[in-house]
UniProtKB/Swiss-Prot annotation:
InterPro entries: ExoRNase_PH_dom1 (IPR001247), ExoRNase_PH_dom2 (IPR015847), ExoRNase_PH_dom2_sf (IPR036345), PNPase/RNase_PH_dom_sf (IPR027408), Ribosomal_Su5_D2-typ_SF (IPR020568), RNase_PH (IPR050080), RNase_PH_bac-type (IPR002381), RNase_PH_CS (IPR018336). It comes from Dinoroseobacter shibae (strain DSM 16493 / NCIMB 14021 / DFL 12). Gene3D superfamilies: GHMP Kinase, N-terminal domain. Keywords: Nucleotidyltransferase, RNA-binding, rRNA processing, Transferase, tRNA processing, tRNA-binding. The keyword Oxidoreductase does not apply. Its EC number is 2.7.7.56. Transmembrane segments: none annotated. One of its GO terms (biological process) is tRNA processing. It catalyses: tRNA(n+1) + phosphate = tRNA(n) + a ribonucleoside 5'-diphosphate. It comes from the Bacteria. SUPFAM superfamilies: Ribonuclease PH domain 2-like, Ribosomal protein S5 domain 2-like. The keyword Phosphoprotein does not apply. This is Ribonuclease PH.
Length: 237
């Protein structure tokens, strides 16, 4: 039995509230169970130096957690004077995941930066960030297209992410913190709405896991991503 009482293939409740902030070109608050992430998209009519005069756009991301997003207060990284390795890893993951679903020629020579700020963490913050980031990006692109700044839709597919793992020997979908902290295997799957794989991150916390177990986790991930894509569609329609 899972601590939450969910079935092995059952997601936590998912909600996406769009237009959560006033100034960003796109924004949403995504909730996956008790995990909540604010995602905002900011459009700039410039690109990094390595892309100047190429005609290509850029999508990047930054990630952070509020000090009391977790059970005990974490020090602000700004106060520490540097980002942790975990933060850098996650924000790079978010950026490259989103770019996998973007036609950068159609985007034009502009940059969209997605900020993902974890308000409350209960497992799966990187997956919630990716899923919510796509919604914020979708809303920002819609605004650019409505203004006539972009003619062809640069978003080629939905992008969403979910965690799966082996908890008490059972493959389970969408781990919360209680499960993640005790899981024998933990994996994150980033996928497109059409079922393409963008990134798979998996590790054994104890004994190695089998290829069959990985296949089972991937099957669960497909179920979860389909549900998340449906939530994205509902939020942006």
């Amino acid at each position: 039995m899972r601590p939450s009482g969910r079935q092995t293939h059952e997601m936590r409740g998912v909600s996406i509230e769009t237009g959560f902030t006033r100034h960003a070109e796109g924004s949403c608050l995504i909730s996956m169970g008790e995990t909540r992430v604010l995602c905002t998209a900011s459009v700039e009519e410039r690109v990094p130096p390595f892309l100047r005069n190429t005609g290509l756009g850029w999508v990047t991301a930054e990630y952070g957690m509020l000090p009391r997003a977790t059970h005990t207060r974490g020090r602000r990284e700004a106060a520490a004077g540097k980002q942790s390795g975990r933060t850098q890893e996650i924000q790079r993951l978010i950026g490259r995941s989103l770019r996998a679903g973007v036609d950068r020629v159609a985007l034009g020579e502009r940059q969209i930066t997605i900020d993902c700020d974890v308000i409350q963490a209960d497992g799966g913050t990187r997956c919630a960030s990716i899923t919510g980031a796509w919604v914020a990006l979708r809303l920002a692109v819609n605004k650019l297209m409505k203004a006539g700044d972009i003619i062809t839709d640069p978003l080629t597919d939905h992008v969403a992410a979910v965690s799966c793992g082996l908890y008490a020997g059972q493959p389970v979908l969408d781990l919360d913190y209680a499960e993640d902290s005790e899981a024998g295997t933990d994996a994150n799957f980033v996928m497109t709405g059409s079922g393409g794989l963008i990134e798979v991150q998996g590790s054994a916390e104890g004994a190695p896991f089998s290829r069959n177990a990985l296949n089972t986790l991937m099957d669960l991930a497909e179920v979860g991503v389909a549900e998340l894509v449906a939530a994205q569609k509902a939020a942006t329609s």
